[in-house]
Amino acid sequence: APCMTLMAAFKPQAEIDKDTRVNETSDLSWIAYNSGKPGREDSVDAWLAQASVEWSAARVNQDKAKSEQEMQVLLCEALSLDPADMLHSAFHSWLYARIVYPLGVPYLVDETQSLYLGGDWCLGARVESAFLSGTSIAKSILRR
């Protein structure tokens, strides 16, 4: 399934809640504060937003500049930020970014338990699913 992503940098906002927001029923299903990582400069507030599968799919053939502009508006609304405070944005779209029907188990293993297959496609559509899959493989190997 497609995924459209916006990175946006704003003038620093002291009063804003910088927690990650996850809402699968929203047009922006995932919003994360990206400036809070160690070693990041604090002269801007950088945010990363991913649109929902439905929102992205509806705009697959739309001009990317228009999709970026629409995401900018959605992000500013979600964060209660003034669009005039946006210093920079970058947009990217992946046509095949998210697994629609995950496998439902953390990994596959051959009969000899010498070959393991894992990844986000096993459990879900996000990097967290890949991490959980890999962790499950490691635990299985360590139990042997």
Predicted regions and their residues:
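Active-site substrate-recognition segment that forms the wall
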Residues: 7-59, 66, 70-79
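Flavin (FAD/FMN) cofactor-binding core of flavoprotein oxidoreductases
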Residues: 69-113
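Short FAD-binding loop at a beta-strand-to-alpha-helix junction that anchors the flavin cofactor
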Residues: 47-48, 105-138
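Short, solvent-exposed loop/turn segments at secondary-structure boundaries
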Residues: 60-63, 128-129
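Active-site-proximal substrate-binding core of FAD-dependent oxidoreductases
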Residues: 84, 140-144
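Short active-site-adjacent structural elements
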Residues: 57-58, 97-100, 124-126
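Glycine-rich beta-alpha-beta "Rossmann" dinucleotide-binding loop(s) and their flanking helix/strand
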Residues: 1-4
